């Protein structure tokens, strides 16, 4: 399949993308092409340039001080301050893809819940009944789930969501890399770099060291098939994709595990994720893509986060993604956001709500002890590590409604006394960073099996972590857990028992938009679970809404470059360096004479507009 080329201009280009902070998202009715501001005052140009340079100098200075990396310090030169990474972001990265949308609820999930409702009673039954109308993601964890006509397939789900009076937003988890789940066994996948005789993956056999056969299977039989479905529905309904949970975080922290650190697995993960992002972004430019970013209890330490940033930078995918998904299939508490990075470390501010630390991570010098703090810290690290990239986050709240239910935060499998958390909502605590809370892991689906399955057979994918003291099935009298992804009735009833849904404060709309809100999650018919007359719909924002400079690529006039070239020819030293850097800095064009309006060259308004278009 053909993949669209990199968004960077090969020759340096005549466009520079400089991020300008905005209180509101830009209007979706404006196309993401180059914007031109025709100045009538020199102050406009001066203010814009001053703001961009001041912001860049400040961010680079902070980065050099915080990270101490030579690569960051090198950015301090004046020329490099001007030469910001040239990013042309796709439509999918322009604004919050969840804002103003009705969210899809899968009938197949409702059917699973109905089985548990039939044997439940009291408050647990009532909560399970409420959960039937709460949207969640659908996992594409094997090739058989891509095509089809039922809501057990990606294609069938998209057709169903498109059939609603208002097409509904669907979230898919892309999860089928070769040598999947290298640091655990519970979710090992169907595609391998090297197959054993029983069809399972041999993680220790690196074969050619590149996983060529596994990657070929992944690309042609999995990603390309998803891409074909996306092309069919592109632009017809909103789609969000979360790419390969656990994969890149494992490469950042678990290379000592030979299953993760061998050359075949590393190649499979890096090349596979890079291909998936670029192929799926090309197939549906409207789809919003988020990469998995583990969680604060995994990558929250500065060294771990730095390694993860370097991994992302090496893939060159920042142009194609909206940001990152955290806590996918995890139990990390949402918490409250702190005002500064190290606010809680060293025993400071222990009484502040944002420093609540149910896992004891702060004592281990991890400042990302909750997922909101982690979102803020990851965004800051990414912005410094990849200049021009300002990612947004979504947080999995499917099972993090309870804090402090684990003896150790590293325990991840079918955690006892967990509760479902915040229902799908864009009313997040930090809306400029976190796009949405969403149930990414389907509550009720097992994380992994006990050593003996419910039917008495030995589980072939048993992971010792699923026998931890915090895992359901490890205590006498508890039922055994089924394999990962299978329905676990006992677990979903506990999740309902300890639920913390935040129904009274939920909206499926951006809180800054003046549209109808709901007091609960949207159903598949776009209805609230508490008020059937209140629905959320996609809405067009008026052209005057929001900062017109935010998230735009700015035009640099070739005529201005020609003028600068005459001065560059006679300059030297620092002046020459700075003049060369100014060649790629956008500025306004003055319509100070009538003959500058029409024409075909970039010395006219008409010619400039044609060139920018």
Residue ranges of predicted features:
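Structural recognition of the beta-strand scaffold that forms the well-ordered cores
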Residues: 102-105, 137-141, 169-174, 238-244, ...
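Surface-exposed substrate-engagement region within the catalytic domains
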Residues: 118-126, 299-471, 569-577
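Intrinsically disordered cytoplasmic terminal tails of membrane proteins
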Residues: 1-32, 75-76
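Mobile, glycine-rich extracellular loop/lid and propeptide segments
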Residues: 168-283, 288-300, 613
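N-terminal signal-anchor transmembrane helix specifying type II single-pass membrane topology
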Residues: 30-62
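N-terminal carbohydrate-binding/catalytic regions of secreted carbohydrate-active enzymes
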Residues: 93-229, 441-471, 475-483, 495-502, ...
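N-terminal, immediately post-signal peptide pro-regions of secreted/luminal proteins
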Residues: 60-91
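Extracellular mucin-like PTS domains
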Residues: 507-508, 513-540
């Amino acid at each position: 399949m053909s993949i669209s080329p990199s968004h960077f201009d090969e020759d340096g280009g005549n466009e520079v993308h400089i991020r300008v902070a905005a209180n509101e998202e830009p209007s979706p009715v404006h196309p993401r092409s180059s914007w031109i501001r025709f100045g009538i005052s020199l102050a406009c140009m001066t203010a814009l340039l001053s703001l961009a340079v001041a912001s860049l100098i400040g961010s680079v200075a902070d980065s050099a001080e915080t990270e101490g990396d030579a690569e960051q310090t090198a950015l301090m030169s004046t020329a490099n301050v001007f030469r910001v990474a040239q990013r042309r972001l796709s439509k999918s990265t322009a604004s919050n893809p969840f804002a103003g949308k009705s969210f899809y609820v899968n009938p197949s999930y409702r059917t699973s819940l109905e089985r548990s409702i039939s044997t439940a009673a009291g408050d647990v039954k009532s909560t399970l009944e409420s959960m039937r109308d709460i949207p969640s993601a659908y996992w594409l964890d094997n090739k058989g789930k891509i095509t089809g006509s039922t809501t057990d397939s990606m294609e069938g789900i998209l057709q169903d969501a498109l059939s609603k009076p208002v097409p509904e937003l669907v979230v898919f988890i892309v999860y089928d890399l070769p040598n999947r789940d290298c640091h655990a066994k519970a979710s090992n996948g169907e595609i391998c770099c090297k197959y054993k005789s029983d069809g399972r993956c041999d993680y220790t056999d690196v074969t050619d060291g590149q996983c060529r056969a596994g990657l070929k299977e992944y690309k042609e039989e999995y990603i390309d098939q998803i891409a074909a479905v996306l092309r069919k529905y592109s632009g017809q309904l909103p789609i969000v994709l979360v790419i390969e949970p656990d994969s890149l975080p494992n490469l950042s922290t678990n290379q000592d595990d030979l299953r993760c650190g061998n050359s075949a697995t590393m190649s499979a993960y890096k090349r596979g994720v890079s291909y998936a992002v670029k192929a799926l972004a090309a197939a549906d430019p409207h789809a919003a893509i988020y990469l998995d970013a583990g969680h604060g209890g995994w990558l929250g330490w500065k060294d771990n986060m730095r390694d993860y940033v370097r991994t992302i930078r090496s893939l060159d995918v920042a142009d194609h993604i909206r940001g990152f998904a955290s806590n996918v299939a995890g139990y990390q508490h949402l918490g409250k956001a702190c005002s500064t990075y190290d606010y809680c470390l060293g025993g400071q501010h222990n009484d502040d709500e944002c420093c609540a630390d149910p896992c004891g991570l702060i004592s281990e010098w991890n400042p990302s002890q909750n997922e909101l703090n982690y979102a803020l810290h990851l965004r800051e690290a990414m912005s410094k590590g990849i200049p021009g990239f300002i990612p947004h986050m979504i947080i999995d709240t499917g099972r993090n409604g309870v804090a402090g239910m684990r003896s150790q935060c590293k325990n991840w499998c079918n955690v006892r006394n967990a509760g479902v958390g915040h229902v799908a909502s864009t009313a997040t605590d930090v809306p400029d960073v976190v796009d949405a809370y969403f149930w990414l892991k389907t509550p009720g689906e097992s994380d992994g099996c006990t050593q003996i399955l419910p039917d008495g057979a030995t589980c072939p994918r048993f992971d010792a972590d699923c026998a931890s003291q915090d895992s359901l099935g490890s205590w006498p009298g508890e039922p055994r857990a089924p394999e990962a992804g299978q329905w676990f009735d006992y677990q979903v009833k506990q999740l309902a028992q300890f639920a913390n849904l935040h129904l009274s404060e939920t909206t499926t709309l951006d809180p800054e938009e003046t549209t109808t809100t709901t007091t609960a999650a949207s159903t598949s018919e776009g209805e609230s679970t508490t008020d059937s007359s209140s629905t959320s719909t996609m809405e067009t924002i008026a052209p005057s809404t929001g900062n017109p400079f935010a998230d735009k690529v700015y035009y640099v006039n070739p005529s201005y470059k020609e003028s600068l070239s005459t001065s560059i020819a006679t300059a030297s030293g620092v002046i020459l360096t700075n003049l060369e850097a100014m060649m790629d800095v956008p500025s306004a064009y003055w319509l100070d004479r009538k003959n500058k309006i029409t024409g075909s060259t970039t010395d006219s308004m008409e010619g400039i507009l044609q060139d920018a278009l």
